[in-house]
Structure formats: C-alpha cells, structure tokens
Amino acid sequence: MKLYNTLTKKIEDFIPNKEGYVKMYTCGPTVYHFAHIGNLRTYISEDILEKALKYVGYKVDRVMNITDVGHMVGDGDSGEDKMLVASKREHKSSYEVAKYYTKCFKSDCEKLNVRWPDTVSPATDNIDEYIKIITKLLDDGYAYISDGNVYFDTTKYDKYYELSGRNADDLMVAVREDIKEDTSKKNPFDFGLWFTNSKFNNQEMQWDSPWGRGYPGWHIECSGISIKYLGENLDIHCGAEDAVFPHHTNEIAQSECYLGHKWCNYWVHFGFLNDKNGKMSKSKGEFLTVSVLEEKGYNPLAYRYLCLNSYYHNALTFSYEILDGAEREYLKLKNKVLSLKEDGEIDTDKFNSYDNKFKEALNNNLNTSMCLTILYDVLKDNSINESTKISLVQKFDTVLSLDLLKENNVVVDKELERKVNE
C-alpha cells in the first residue's frame, strides 16, 4: 500500500515494523460538544484506512483516545480547558459533560458506519502513564518547571519543525484576542506537560503528582496512551490536518525524547471540510452535526458516500446542493444493488479480477473514488452473473460500509423517490 506521509511530504510504500501487522493510533475527540461533520470526516477517513489495511491482508491493532481533560481553547497552552468551558456552559460537572458527549460521538460513528476502535481510552484513565513520561523528561533535561507547571523545552529537540515543514518565524501567528498567552514558558513553542493550580484555580479535574496537584497537558495524553497500549514503535498515526501543529509536532518531540528513538514512521492527515464560510469549526458558533442532517431528511450514509468520492488528503467542499447530489447517487446505487438476485454459482475468475482491481485502488493511496468506479463497473458488467455481483458488493462494502445490501436502511417515501428520480 502507498500512503501520503506528512513526515516526508511524499507518497511512500507502507512498510510496517512487523510484517502483516499494523499498530495504528488515531486522535479521538475532545468531548466538550457535539462532533460536527467536518470532525467526522476525519473519523470516516480513519475508518476507511483501517478497513482498507484489513482488506489487503493486514492485521490492525487500533487505539483511540477520548480527550476529557487538558485541551485548551487555543489548542496550545492558552485559554481555558475546553471541558471547563463546557461545564460552565451547561451547568454540569466536567465528568458529566464528557460522559454525555462521548455517548453522542459514539452514536454518530454508528450512524456513519465508523467502526469503534479495538481500544478506546479516556485521557483521565491514564494519569500514571503521563506522570511516568514527564518524570523521565525532567530527569533527562527535556522539560523544566516554571510557576509550578511542567513544560517541554522545544529547543532541546532539534527535529521539532520536521513534521510541519516550517520554522519558528513561519509559525509565529497572532494570538486570538480572547486568549491570554501563557507567560510561564521559556520559549514561545514550549508546551505544557503538567499544570498545577498556578495555571487555573477553578479546574475541576485534578490529580496528585510529584509537582503538585493538577492535571496533564493535552499533548502528553496521546503519547502516553499510544505508548501504553501500542508500545514504543508505532506504524501509523492519524488525525486532521490542523493537528500537524502543534499537537502532532509536540507528540513527536516528547515521545522521541522519552523513548530515545524514532517513534512513528507514517503520519497520515485528512483534509478539512469547507463550507461557504471556510473551514467548518465549532469556534464559529454554528456547525452541522449528523443529527442536523437527519432532521433535514438526509441519510447519514449519504455523507459517508460524499467523503468516499474525494481524496482524503484534500479539502472537501460541502453544501446542501452537493449533499443532495451525493444522496441521489447513493440511493440510486443502493436501489440497483438491492435489485440483484442470486442466479447461480460465483464466477471465481471474474470475482478475483474485480477484487484485485479494488485492492489496487486501495493500495494507491486510498483511492476510494476509484473504488466506487470499480463498483459501478461491476454492476454494469453484463458478462458476469448477479450472484457474482452480489458477492463483490458484499466484499467491497467491508471497506465502503454503505450498507448496500441492507434493505432496512432504505427509506421509502415520496421525498426519497423524488430525490432518486431527479
């Protein structure tokens, strides 16, 4: 399989550390609000990657975190913890907020046929792991204590800008006016590993540590969870493209300084979902969720179909007109598949030929739009019987996950008929 590796800025042959076995870590949601469909594009893409790896023969061990503490509004060390903001907004405890939005996120994943990973671990379940890593970073001189907080010293890691491909001057951007910059750091890009009450005295989630009662920084959480469950050598790390800096950059720095060697070989990032106002974002106040799409009469899998028609690394433009078109195509495809009837033995040669084409498309940097083209070619091919077509659809759908053979997923009403026939 070939994948675009953000670390090297090129498409490369994927070679795992252990033949036939892939260790894959994916950054999970910060559960302070509903996930919008832009967030969910990333999880759809990660789901496709995992299923594609399995389709072409790999065993995959995938881990995802749930960020329920430590993620600041500014994505660095600036502003308040997002969980604290949500707690104030909803007049609930941070734990109640996290539990509710984790449940909502899992429900959205189910509606989009995004498989729940083998291991899903909330950040708050792994405090001892973070303390162990931070202690070693301090002992080895990669971190320092300032105003009671522990920070990673980015000047001690000479490959700090490798993932982003930029330098300090490029990354010095204006700070949002509503966010107070952390003045305890020695250097602008140093980042928090552990915060004590000198950072926020109203933080609800706190734990004892060698440096005082407090809570972990956002970046240490993913490193700690990944190393705990997947070990010291990671094959693939995924996330949205805005995680390249600072989140994934900081993960690499602290992980490699802690381990003393390269940590992850392939970094796979997914493009934004853009609407008429640019990147879809919670900070803008209004955003689309799966529930909103359902309220407007859309099948969530029409959105998955839309994502499958695009290249994962590029931005995807969203509008209701575009989604209308995707839903029409999806429903026509599903109706065509459901019209197929078993009519004899499977043609093994034809099956293997199309199966290999599908694998080739997946191996070509997850070319899912080509996968859909191959599916349509199967349905149009008059030289193969319908039993063979059904078997191919069934296998292809282990990756596409569009419920193409599930009749109970079809809504039969006048609006649907209108959409299909337009």
Where are these regions (language model features)?
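N-terminal, positively charged nucleic-acid-binding surface of large information/translation enzymes
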Residues: 8, 17-113
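Short, glycine/charge-rich beta-strand/loop segments that flank catalytic centers
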Residues: 63-69, 98-105, 115-130, 148-157
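The substrate-binding groove and active-site-proximal loops of carbohydrate-active enzymes
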Residues: 85-93, 119-124, 212
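Short catalytic-loop micro-motif centered on adjacent basic/acidic residues
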Residues: 117-121, 237-239, 383
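Structural preference for alpha-helix termini/caps and helix-kink/transition segments
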Residues: 279-282, 287-422
